[in-house]
């Protein structure tokens, strides 16, 4: 039987932090009823029982293993405190005093020593357990949890604890225990060296749990106010109210994905604890957006299950624990909608790993393992598994990231398409310019380097630098802000346009695009990156990267850098001749105070300048997968290949190998002559893309004509990518006129039949021969139709015509023998300027309109035609 002892100066009833006496019935019922709960219980017993039994025979066996305090054996402390914590939990569940005794004896020897301990200072950082930063996350939380679960046991005058100093038993010293929890709480909050970031959250439970174990109500409230409000504003520790307010407008923590998700999960744990102890704050109901935002993370994963990676982040990021926290909170607070959604999503996540089979371990950092039992809720077999919502276009606002995916395939893992571009300043940001990652054939192929163990040399001089990502460096300048303050690492990349817009539905199963701009004042340049993601079949597609870049000063040269996991990278001209590459000293040095990171490139070989088209092939020989890169002719460039350091967490074991790199150097500006690369992932060495030609609008390069052959079908895409939505591209030879930022004309020819697709991603109008597509109110549109014949010609047989096609003010309606037709006159932006009814030879006066290009649309009962004409007064 559990006895409750409450001091006269406090109102808390123990246990209270992770679980209460009232919670016990449901927890033990779960242990009896459900395999997942009974499994956790059995695992806890198997881990603790041998130690419990040994301790009963000889207490000094375990107690004598406590490392020195203060000292550096953090692992030894963690193992012992974890044993005590698990034993304390088992005492709570079973009322077996042997578990309580083991936990209490370990606790007492720690609290007696810590109450007297003076922290050790090394390199300006104070610590008790060997690491000022990690101990606040590992050891500090375990001590109050042990204390809470055995509080009534140790304060029962009938019980004693074993004291190694006297080699005998004594009464538990609650005074030293109280001194310890206060000391740890204050030490935790004072040790934070990076305010206004996730550090106070990661260390926060070390402070919160110790504060909530302070007996005296007045003192506890004073400490809690410092944690929650910090009214003095003197602590480096971020008040929890600041933390809650710091979530982004998308309701996610504004750092890299792995730090964001982890931080948000810890915040949920703290919210649940605070709400248990201080319900009057109404912290859950007032901050439901923190729960809502957790589902956004599912949008940040490639089809293989690897997370996108920007800044100091990782690929393998589990989402189960964060959904378990939502379910725990929602169940305790009786929030039906949140309960239902969390259960459905968890059911889906469990299905991916063969069911929910929890494994008890000693958590190496953040400690939450026991909560799977204490806060766990069963998910019935009748619950329907539901994948978290994912979208075709996703914007990560704080990181300046836009990602797009095309899963219009029967096998999204192998044939799904997905990429991201962007960059910004946030905690743990890298200076990247407008970086990019590309997915294909089950792997993240186009990669940034990632982050390892923060080795000072390679992390500072490469991993966080431009050359570790896929970007463009201007005039060798790769400056960045001060990492130590995370205030202005780089300027934020802004989204100019995308189709679909973030979180909206795509209008096409084949075409998506985004365009982003960076005003890089650190490196005195303006850059714009437009990526079109083009699907050509269920199993094929490509990315068209159009990267514009110009210096605000002298345009000496621009370097386009692209990393792709693999074994080799080779280059050939478009005619299949090998590109001559010779050893080069390029990239061996950096400009002083402008570290790009490219000095980490090795085995650099470069070409002479050439205007010929060049194709690169990245080969993943062990898995027979490839990335084909097509760079059209027309602009003089120098091409290089190199070897970069291994890419962290690269799939298919390529994290063990150096990373192949391709670079392109272009002298002069790269704005009117942007870099254009078509990337096609393929299984096998026969890509579907056969040729890529740049599209010209006067002297400007504005996209590419891409010809693919897929299953015997010849697909021709005119992918038009202009710098702004008000610009007009005219191609007389191909009978194309487009006003807009991004558009595609596609013809697919097979067996004498031509399919045509007209796509406006962002713009106002697109004409191909007689067909005109006018954008909708969202400035996009899609039109598809079939034409008999292998080629498309201007419709010269129709009796519906206007003339002349160049007029000084008047046009004539040619309607043949029709008695009456309907007509409408449109501007290039799709605005209807004039409409009505006409008969053959009706003259329409347009002299009131300004010079320019217009469309006339004519309709009778049997047909509809659109015809372009020019008004030139």
Sequence positions of predicted segments:
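Catalytic and substrate-binding regions of extracellular carbohydrate-active enzymes
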Residues: 351-579, 669-671, 677, 681-684, ...
